């Protein structure tokens, strides 16, 4: 393509017309503000919210209905019968048109910038990530999503979020454009004529003007494309916001087998399940247990800042929560109705990928809690350890005035939150849990207070030895098994974080690491940790029994 042909297309604004006609309102992102100026091109986009009732009037002209800098609070003074009346308007005038983008100008004293309407940000509860200058929304699953991007002289917003906002406000979005092109070529050289073309469509009003350029040196031809394109919101019932109910999908889960041995599945939609109030009597009950491989919890343990796997409950911050039976010896079990009531469809599909045929019943702990209405302590070792540790720390501090195990820092808090019996035979998972437990029990020992409690202690004595000496001073002569456990855990932890040497091999042999699977080994380690805490509880605090946990 020749330079002259390229210039002809540019002056006729063919590329920009294609963008306006084919992409605005169809692309997933809408440019609601943009400003750029080069030697031969000036491009400006802006936007405003137009009441639905004003759409015919607005489309009657290609001029902008709100200019950059307008849409801020102001007053208008009216005169009637010689009397002046001043009224305040939130957006500066009384025509019902509102800004989506507000241009903040400080007359050169401070840098100007643009911001998105506060109402829009609050409507979608957007979080401003100041580092990347973007706004994030959160879906029903707790996943974050980019909603708006601000980059210098450009603002883009997700189309679907704009449209749901428009639907609720009963407004249209007007995307204004003003694009000016200049060329050194004459009209004759370009093969174009002076023109003023107006275009009107159901959602578009624009005008293209081409004429001689006689105002700037070296510019022979100029063109200007100015106008607006309107974007409507969907019908209110399709938005799923506020008071309308979304058409939520529900996954089906395996709940049993038929006489031929084939799997039987059923939807988890609570409205299609039986309950104790007589609903759907021929359907499976909402309390039908659904079984899952324990690996279903992997992604939740892997992100402790967002998820918390608790005794009988899975929590995604304050977004959602799911009751579950994680005290089961082999599986995770969830009631069918809870899957539909508490999980989004996206999360249901994740759980379904770990769904297996039922095998036996729910745990005794879950049965007592769910059907007998009784308080029941956890019996799965990782859950027991967390409960016992919490109680021990509280009781020890009440007696001695200081914690034996110092609280983990915010940066290390995940060690306790995500502590669990390994779900797989992956060595890295086992090592990470050993590291976490060692950080909780060994690296968190309150060495300063232990040293203060034993004044004659050798200054070179380290953590576990300090605890050993403290216990001896307290008259405990039967603590060697627990001290040995802590030393073995220390050696195992050293091998998990460094090259695995002789000390690690001895500790691994002590814990039976070569003879049993990783889950069984770490379960046994946690039992010894629970025994240690109960021993200290009984001998130094006078609480409970020091009898070892049953294996």
Feature locations, PLM:
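Amphipathic alpha-helical interface elements
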Residues: 1-323, 337-484, 488, 521, ...
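Short alpha-helical linear motifs
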Residues: 507-512, 533-534
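Amphipathic, charged alpha-helical scaffolds that flank and support histidine-based chemistry
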Residues: 514-522
């Amino acid at each position: 393509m020749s330079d002259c042909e390229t210039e002809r297309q540019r002056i006729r604004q063919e590329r920009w017309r294609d963008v306006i006609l084919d992409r605005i309102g169809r692309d997933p992102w809408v440019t609601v503000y943009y400003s750029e100026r080069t030697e031969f091109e000036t491009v400006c986009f802006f936007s405003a919210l137009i009441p639905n009732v004003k759409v015919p009037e607005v489309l009657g002209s290609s001029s902008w209905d709100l200019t950059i800098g307008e849409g801020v609070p102001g007053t208008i003074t009216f005169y009637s019968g010689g009397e002046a009346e001043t009224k305040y308007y939130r957006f500066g005038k009384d025509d019902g048109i509102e800004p989506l983008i507000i241009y903040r100008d400080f007359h050169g004293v401070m840098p100007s910038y643009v911001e998105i309407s506060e109402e829009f940000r609050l409507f979608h509860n957007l979080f401003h990530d100041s580092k990347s200058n973007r706004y994030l929304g959160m879906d029903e699953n707790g996943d974050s999503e980019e909603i708006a991007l601000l980059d210098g002289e450009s603002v883009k917003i997700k189309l679907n979020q704009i449209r749901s906002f428009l639907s609720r406000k009963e407004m249209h979005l007007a995307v204004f454009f003003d694009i000016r092109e200049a060329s050194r070529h004459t009209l004759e050289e370009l093969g174009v004529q002076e023109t003023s073309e107006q275009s009107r469509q159901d959602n578009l009003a624009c005008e293209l003007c081409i004429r001689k350029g006689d105002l700037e040196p070296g510019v022979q031809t100029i063109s200007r494309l100015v106008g607006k394109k309107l974007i409507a919101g969907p019908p209110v019932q399709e938005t799923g916001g506020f008071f309308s109910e979304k058409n939520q999908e529900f996954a089906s889960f395996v709940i049993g087998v038929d006489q031929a041995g084939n799997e039987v599945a059923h939807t988890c939609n609570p409205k299609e399940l039986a309950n104790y109030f007589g609903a759907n009597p021929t359907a499976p009950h909402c309390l039908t247990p659904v079984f899952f491989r324990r690996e279903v919890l992997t992604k939740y343990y892997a992100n402790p800042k967002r998820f918390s796997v608790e005794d009988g409950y899975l929590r995604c911050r304050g977004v959602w929560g799911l009751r579950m039976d994680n005290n089961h010896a082999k599986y995770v079990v969830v009631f069918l109705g809870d899957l539909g009531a508490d999980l989004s469809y996206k999360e249901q599909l994740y759980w379904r990928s770990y769904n297996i045929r039922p095998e036996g019943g729910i745990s005794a702990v879950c049965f007592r809690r769910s059907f007998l209405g009784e308080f029941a302590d956890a019996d799965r070792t990782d859950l027991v350890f967390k409960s016992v540790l919490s109680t021990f720390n509280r009781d020890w501090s009440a007696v001695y005035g200081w914690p034996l195990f110092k609280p983990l820092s915010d940066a290390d808090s995940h060690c306790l939150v995500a502590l669990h019996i390994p779900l797989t035979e992956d060595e890295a998972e086992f090592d990470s849990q050993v590291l976490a437990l060692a950080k909780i029990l060994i690296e968190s020992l309150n060495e300063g207070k232990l040293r203060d409690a034993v004044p004659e202690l050798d200054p070179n004595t380290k953590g576990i030895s300090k605890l050993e000496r403290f216990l001896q001073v307290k008259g405990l002569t039967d603590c060697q098994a627990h001290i040995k456990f802590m030393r073995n855990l220390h050696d195992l932890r050293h091998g998990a974080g460094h090259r695995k040497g002789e000390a690690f091999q001895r500790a691994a042999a002590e814990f039976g690491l070569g003879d049993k699977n990783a889950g069984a080994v770490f379960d046994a380690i946690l039992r010894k940790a629970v025994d240690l805490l109960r021993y200290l509880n009984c001998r130094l605090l006078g609480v409970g029994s020091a009898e070892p946990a049953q294996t």
